[in-house]
């Protein structure tokens, strides 16, 4: 496999960091503005989900199969990529089972939210931050390796994850801000959770770098594809549907796929 220059590593890490920092944007929406338009939020989440599914199944999975093809024949390479894909789905499903991700975004304008005791809400915020941080590690690893191998693949994936991180930031910020009334603490809580993505990227690269080979890259990309598809189906699309009863989810899903498809075609020219 090719040796990556410091500039390539810096670009991949910077993009991963930027995607993670979108979590902080969620805190701004809680502290400085009213609740976002549910229909717009539904469209945005579905857009990110469609983009994530499309790029995972068409580009990242293909990268896995291509890497395995350097050491196996075509059929066995596809089988190995499929096994890695299923392993990624199974692994993130296990993490989701052990550390459930809070899918319901807390709304600071909700009367029932206002009536809750601050100490209890503070615990909710800590649990949300912990759960989302645990889920951010594999997302950071996915963004980093996808961008490192091919920025044309990594950039759309990073955009999808960045959009996905905004409501996660809201999930952390709403209870923390209600409990503490401190903008500083709210921003820090979201920032620390978002930094889990570049941290996951750095740790993953340091662990895998001495062993980089076609088999390792094939496994990593297959696992990444499985993780991203699971996150889209388990988190983004259900959340999008919950925020709107109309067709925004379907429109967002198809638009996300279409935009990523066209962008990938343009990148290939």
Swiss-Prot record:
<dbReference type="GO" id="GO:0046872">
    <property type="term" value="F:metal ion binding"/>
</dbReference>
<keyword id="KW-0864">Zinc transport</keyword>
<feature type="binding site" description="M1 metal binding site">
    <location>
        <position position="164"/>
    </location>
    <ligand>
        <name>Zn(2+)</name>
    </ligand>
</feature>
<keyword id="KW-0813">Transport</keyword>
<feature type="binding site" description="M2 metal binding site">
    <location>
        <position position="136"/>
    </location>
    <ligand>
        <name>Fe(2+)</name>
    </ligand>
</feature>
<feature type="binding site" description="M2 metal binding site">
    <location>
        <position position="197"/>
    </location>
    <ligand>
        <name>Fe(2+)</name>
    </ligand>
</feature>
<keyword id="KW-0997">Cell inner membrane</keyword>
<keyword id="KW-1003">Cell membrane</keyword>
<feature type="transmembrane region" description="Helical">
    <location>
        <begin position="12"/>
        <end position="32"/>
    </location>
</feature>
<feature type="transmembrane region" description="Helical">
    <location>
        <begin position="41"/>
        <end position="61"/>
    </location>
</feature>
<dbReference type="GO" id="GO:0005886">
    <property type="term" value="C:plasma membrane"/>
</dbReference>
<feature type="transmembrane region" description="Helical">
    <location>
        <begin position="126"/>
        <end position="146"/>
    </location>
</feature>
<feature type="binding site" description="M2 metal binding site">
    <location>
        <position position="165"/>
    </location>
    <ligand>
        <name>Fe(2+)</name>
    </ligand>
</feature>
<dbReference type="InterPro" id="IPR003689">
    <property type="entry name" value="ZIP"/>
</dbReference>
<feature type="binding site" description="M1 metal binding site">
    <location>
        <position position="139"/>
    </location>
    <ligand>
        <name>Zn(2+)</name>
    </ligand>
</feature>
<keyword id="KW-0812">Transmembrane</keyword>
<feature type="transmembrane region" description="Helical">
    <location>
        <begin position="152"/>
        <end position="172"/>
    </location>
</feature>
<feature type="transmembrane region" description="Helical">
    <location>
        <begin position="75"/>
        <end position="95"/>
    </location>
</feature>
<dbReference type="Pfam" id="PF02535">
    <property type="entry name" value="Zip"/>
</dbReference>
<dbReference type="GO" id="GO:0005385">
    <property type="term" value="F:zinc ion transmembrane transporter activity"/>
</dbReference>
<feature type="transmembrane region" description="Helical">
    <location>
        <begin position="249"/>
        <end position="269"/>
    </location>
</feature>
<keyword id="KW-0406">Ion transport</keyword>
<comment type="function">
    <text>Mediates zinc uptake. May also transport other divalent cations.</text>
</comment>
<feature type="binding site" description="M2 metal binding site">
    <location>
        <position position="139"/>
    </location>
    <ligand>
        <name>Fe(2+)</name>
    </ligand>
</feature>
<keyword id="KW-0479">Metal-binding</keyword>
<feature type="binding site" description="M1 metal binding site">
    <location>
        <position position="168"/>
    </location>
    <ligand>
        <name>Zn(2+)</name>
    </ligand>
</feature>
<comment type="similarity">
    <text>Belongs to the ZIP transporter (TC 2.A.5) family. ZupT subfamily.</text>
</comment>
<keyword id="KW-1133">Transmembrane helix</keyword>
<dbReference type="InterPro" id="IPR023498">
    <property type="entry name" value="Zn_transptr_ZupT"/>
</dbReference>
<keyword id="KW-0408">Iron</keyword>
<feature type="transmembrane region" description="Helical">
    <location>
        <begin position="211"/>
        <end position="231"/>
    </location>
</feature>
<feature type="binding site" description="M2 metal binding site">
    <location>
        <position position="168"/>
    </location>
    <ligand>
        <name>Fe(2+)</name>
    </ligand>
</feature>
<keyword id="KW-0862">Zinc</keyword>
<feature type="transmembrane region" description="Helical">
    <location>
        <begin position="187"/>
        <end position="207"/>
    </location>
</feature>
<keyword id="KW-0472">Membrane</keyword>
<protein>
    <recommendedName>
        <fullName>Zinc transporter ZupT</fullName>
    </recommendedName>
</protein>
């Amino acid at each position: 496999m090719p040796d990556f220059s410091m500039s390539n590593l810096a670009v991949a890490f910077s993009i991963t960091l930027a995607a993670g920092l979108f979590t902080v944007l969620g805190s701004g929406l809680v502290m400085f503005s009213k609740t976002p338009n549910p229909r717009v939020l539904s469209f945005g989440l579905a857009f990110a989900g469609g983009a994530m599914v499309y790029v995972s199944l068409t580009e990242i999975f293909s990268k896995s199969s291509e890497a395995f093809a350097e050491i196996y024949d075509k059929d066995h390479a596809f089988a190995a990529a499929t096994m890695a894909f299923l392993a990624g789905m199974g692994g993130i499903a296990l993490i989701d089972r052990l550390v459930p991700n809070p899918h319901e975004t807390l709304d600071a304008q909700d009367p029932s939210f206002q009536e809750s005791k601050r100490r209890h809400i503070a615990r909710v915020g800590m649990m949300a931050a912990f759960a989302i941080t645990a889920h951010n590690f594999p997302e950071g690893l996915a963004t980093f390796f996808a961008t490192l191998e091919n920025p044309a693949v990594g950039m759309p994936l990073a955009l999808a994850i960045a959009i996905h991180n905004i409501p996660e930031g809201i999930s952390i910020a709403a209870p923390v801000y209600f409990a503490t009334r401190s903008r500083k603490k709210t921003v820090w809580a979201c920032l620390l959770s978002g930094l889990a993505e570049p941290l996951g990227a750095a740790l993953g690269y340091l662990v895998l770098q001495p062993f980089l080979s076609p088999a390792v890259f094939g496994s990593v990309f297959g696992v990444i594809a499985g993780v991203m598809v699971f996150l889209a189906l388990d988190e983004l699309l259900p959340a999008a549907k919950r925020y709107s009863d109309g067709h925004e989810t379907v429109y967002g899903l198809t638009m996300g796929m279409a935009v990523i498809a066209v962008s990938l075609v343009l990148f290939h020219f």
